Amino acid sequence: MAGKKRESSLQIALSNQEQWEEALSTKGLQVVDVYQAWCGPCKPTVSLFRKIKNELGDDLLHFAVAESDTIDSLVKYRGKCEPTFLFLAGGELVAVVRGANGPLLQKTIIEQLAAEKKVLNQGSERHVIKDEVLLEEEDEIAPVQAQTEDEELVPSGKSYTVAIIKPDAVAHGKTDEIIMKIQESGFEILANEERTMTESEAREFYQHRAGEEKFQELIQFMSSGPCHILIISKSEEDEDVIPAWREFIGPTDVEIAKKEKPESLRAQYGTEVLYNAVHGSNDREQASRELAFFFPNFKISNESLKELTSVKPERTLALIRPEILKERKDEILQSIKDAGFSIAMQKEVMLTEHQVQEFYKEHINEDYYPALLKQMTSGPVLALALVKDNAVGHWRNMLGPASLSQALSEAPDSLRAQFAPSDSETNQLHGSSTTEEAKKEINFFFPVEHTLATIKPDALEEHRDEILEQIQGAGFTISQIKEANLNREMAEEFYKEHKGKPFFEQLVNYMCRGPCLMMILSKENAVHEWRSLMGPTDPAEAQKVLPDSLRGKFAKSILQNAVHGSSNSDHAMEKIKFIFGDIDLDRIVHESFGETPETSASDISRNAAAQGDDPEQDESKEMEE
């Protein structure tokens, strides 16, 4: 709760026209995060604003968040998916920043605050601007607005989704045939645009899949030729088009589609996973993002917008138990993806008896508990944080009855029935029963962690702003930050585990060359997430497999590889203490995230590291450290 109070006192919430007009009368500089109801304010910038406010300590600097959907003055900002920050002074617009660009935001705040002080103290003229992006959009839309207004409106009460006929199907001349089948099946096509995506556009569109093995191949394929981008709705007003469309196109894997859904579009026109002919949005949030990406000027009726924003994506915990994890993991993960879930986090971990008792403490007195305990400690468990509209309910429905015999007899198509072991009476899949339980269970397996991150001397000098921007864009909170010049003694202690190795002297000399930027980064699963953002140690490998990683972009060599990260939770705690001293990390969690992780969650994290959950944890033995 302390975290929420602190955030609310930092940013005033504006949700109607009256509050907006009142805010315009505020003396000084007002920085307003204008957001859409479906996506909420830009959270990664909160820690930056708090840091700036604390450092400047200026009563003339104010922060606010404003919901464009409910404020008349912000009508032109509706339907924009890019974070937008308006700088207001004297009730007038003096600057605009688009995107969560931390360094640019900080620079603009400092410059505009100084300018406003000159206006107030010296009578200087205030430089008022107009939002040029909005003016350009108005110029583009005005000539055709009258004739397209009715065509560009999603009818009241209807849901919509974005569909793509991919380059393979277009190249084979199947576009008209696919469109005819779409219409014959009761779908309405509200818009149809042929478009060839650039690699940059494809990379942005599929950024949520950047960690996948075939990501680069996907980008090259999607930018290899023209696609047809469609906006699809259903004839019946009360029918949700998204699940209907996903059912119609079939499973992602073409072979599975041919076997299980032979009449689906992917079964008929796809050739393999990437070349599967068509794309469909996973959920309403993704549909809205994709609509804004391809059709930024497309209008949505107020009723449709209200329906869209009434359902918020939620998270739930899924567990794949040991008996089927080894043999059928890929099949289960594919079923999860085909159902429209996004996997936000995953962790494979060996549980101790104590951890199982803590997690299932409400089941200890049940007759089935001994068998459950034996099952849960017999091998690694895969924990997944799943994201989707009504994720808890959807996942529970897919699982079927908890009783394996009941699942087999009454719900043979449920996941528990499909993946039932031959010699066990314990079902092999778990799902949270309520949203509150999901929150607790996700926190149990994926606690808010802290890791030490370092921007090394050469990268700090050349790429500081870009690296910080990418860190904040990845959702990390920079809980502590300081620039430090390591002397030889400090550098040797920092890398003491490498003492005696051939590269030790070279590494120490390099780290003493100039200042480093030391940070405590906080996030769920922070150690693993930071290592993923850094990328492989060798920049040649990083550029090949993760070109958008920090090392893929900014590393020069294995020694000069831009950034450093702790290899596991224990290593992170040791290095944080060395750099920042005795710091209250629990207080940081409480203030930044409004909650304190369960004790058992920390145990889970340490146990995962001990079991080798992080495939890069042994990298501490290598030169990158």
Curated annotation (Swiss-Prot):
CDD domains: NDPk, NDPk_TX, TRX_NDPK
PROSITE patterns given in the database record: NDPK_LIKE, THIOREDOXIN_1
The entry's keywords: Cell projection, Cytoplasm, Cytoskeleton
Listed Gene3D superfamilies: Glutaredoxin (3.40.30.10), Nucleoside diphosphate kinase-like domain (3.30.70.141)
Region spans: NDK: 158-302
Biased composition (Acidic residues): 613-625
First and last residue of the signal peptide: none
GO molecular function: nucleoside diphosphate kinase activity
One Pfam family, short name: NDK
GO annotation, cellular component aspect: cell projection; cytoskeleton; dynein axonemal particle
InterPro entries: NDK-like_dom, NDK-like_dom_sf, Nucleoside_diP_kinase, Thioredoxin-like_sf, Thioredoxin_CS, Thioredoxin_domain, TXND_domain-containing
Chief localisation class: cytoplasm
Family membership: Belongs to the NDK family.
Record text on subunit structure and interactions: Monomer and homodimer.
Designated name of the protein: Thioredoxin domain-containing protein 6
